[in-house]
Every structure is written in structure tokens, then in C-alpha cells.
A protein has these predicted regions:
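Patatin-like phospholipase
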Residues: 1-128
Length: 128
């Protein structure tokens, strides 16, 4: 019996793994604006109970905000060194993980396309 969980629990932005695997440059796509600061997970009492057979998962959830913050610090460092090109939403749209608002989803999609189009030449230069 095997249980699989999202890898984002332990490495939300696996950029350093890409470097360790031999990449010399990476394109990082963030789903939150650069100003986003991840907070500790809510509902600890619920996930501690639900995941009691998986103490390492509980620890990963408990520390996820700290790992994310370190990931973002690493991203900024690599971006400054010219080794990472970072795409992030240019503005914040208030959308929760479990939102089912088609209009808001379309706005977020359109923002991503617009942000990408605005930096397409920069991406070509970075990759060449």
C-alpha cells in the first residue's frame, strides 16, 4: 500500500534540484506575485490527526512556509546572478486554492498570457 503526496510539500520551487541535475539556467514560474509571503499552514490540528501515520509529512507541512521562503530567497539570488528568469503574476488576484470562480480563473489566465507576452523577448534572450 503506497500513498503519494504532492512534491510541493517538501520543495515548492525545485530550482536548486534542477541545478544539481546539471542545468546551468532555469526559468521559474511562480503562481503568486513576488510580494507573496507564505504563512504557516492552517488547520494543523486537522492534518496532524489525518496524517498521524505519516510524521514526516506532518513535519513537512509544519515547515512548508519556511522552506518556501528559503526557496524564494534562492530564486532571487539565482535571478540576480543571471541564472534564473522568473515569471510571476504582475498583480495579485484574490483567488483561493479551492476557488471555483470561472471569471476569476479567466482573469488569472489572461494575466499570465499578458505577462508572458510582455517578456517574450527577454525569455528568448535568456535562453539563447
Amino acid at each position: 500500500d503506497q500513498t503519494d503526496l504532492d512534491g510541493g510539500l517538501s520543495d515548492s520551487v525545485p530550482m536548486m534540484r534542477a541545478f544539481a541535475k546539471g542545468c546551468d539556467r532555469v526559468v521559474v514560474i511562480l503562481s503568486k506575485p513576488r510580494s507573496f509571503v507564505k504563512q504557516p499552514e492552517g488547520f494543523r490540528h486537522i492534518y496532524r490527526h489525518a496524517l498521524r501515520k505519516y510524521p514526516q509529512t506532518i513535519a513537512a507541512l509544519d515547515n512548508r512556509h519556511l522552506m518556501y521562503r528559503q526557496n524564494i530567497a534562492d530564486v532571487k539570488k539565482q535571478e540576480s546572478a543571471g541564472k534564473a528568469l522568473v515569471f510571476a503574476p504582475s498583480k495579485e488576484l484574490k483567488m483561493s486554492t479551492y476557488a471555483r470562480d470561472e471569471k476569476l480563473e479567466q482573469e488569472l489566465y489572461d494575466l499570465g498570457i499578458s505577462d508572458f507576452d510582455a517578456r517574450l523577448n527577454e525569455l528568448h534572450t535568456f535562453l539563447s
